[in-house]
Amino acid sequence: MIASLRGTVINIGLSSAVIECNGVGYEVVTTPNTLSQLVRGEEALVLTTMVVREDAMKLYGFIDNESREMFSVLQTVSGLGPRLALACESVLSPLEISQAITNADAKALQRVPGVGKRMADRLIVELKGKVAAFAAGVVDEAGEQISLPNANIASEVVVEQVSQALVGLGFSEKQSDDAVSFVLAADPSLDTSGALRAALAKLSGK
């Protein structure tokens, strides 16, 4: 299994990046938050997990071991695959996911596009005994975290990545751009995860 990649970022797309290692480009599917911390042409270390299906093999990438472990734990829920697991981590941090499950906060989980009441309840029932380590913050942080780019680049990337993520979740470009502009005008210090959560809250009328 490919557990990590260290190499040059040669492309950043809507939901994935390509990292070149020893002349081979690996496509890594990941969250907007991880994508926002990659810079084209620079070296990065991304922790990975491979998901093998009958029709495809995909690499999923994460900035830290906690996120990677949560991705695996989420997929132990019946009916929840890698796509929805990644959507959960696009909206909520591992700590927020674990807190929502521990506190039986179905509404917090339903902020994730694709997670309805039934799936939220299933997450709470099936994972309540599996997320204590995340809530306590004691998951082993193996591997380095990706360095953040400078503030100007980060600001531009937040706008682009959050807008693209919202479009990927089914919102129109205008809805996405308007929501991102609104939340960043209210709080310019928001990072990608924070801006995405705030934009989703605005779009859902919460």
Swiss-Prot record:
Main localization category: cytoplasm
Instruction: State the coiled-coil residue ranges.
Output: none
Name the UniProt key words of this record, in alphabetical order: Cytoplasm, DNA damage, DNA recombination, DNA repair, DNA-binding
Pfam families the UniProt entry points to = HHH_5 (PF14520), RuvA_C (PF07499), RuvA_N (PF01330)
Give this protein's Gene Ontology molecular function annotations: ATP binding; four-way junction DNA binding; four-way junction helicase activity
Q: Is-annotated flag, keyword Membrane?
A: no
- Family recorded in the similarity comment: Belongs to the RuvA family.
What is the documented function of this protein?
A: The RuvA-RuvB-RuvC complex processes Holliday junction (HJ) DNA during genetic recombination and DNA repair, while the RuvA-RuvB complex plays an important role in the rescue of blocked DNA replication forks via replication fork reversal (RFR). RuvA specifically binds to HJ cruciform DNA, conferring on it an open structure. The RuvB hexamer acts as an ATP-dependent pump, pulling dsDNA into and through the RuvAB complex. HJ branch migration allows RuvC to scan DNA until it finds its consensus sequence, where it cleaves and resolves the cruciform DNA.
What does its UniProt record remark on the domains? Answer: Has three domains with a flexible linker between the domains II and III and assumes an 'L' shape. Domain III is highly mobile and contacts RuvB.
What protein name is recorded for this chain? Holliday junction branch migration complex subunit RuvA
- Supply the source organism for this entry: Corynebacterium glutamicum (strain R)
**Upper lineage ranks?**
Bacteria, Bacillati, Actinomycetota, Actinomycetes, Mycobacteriales
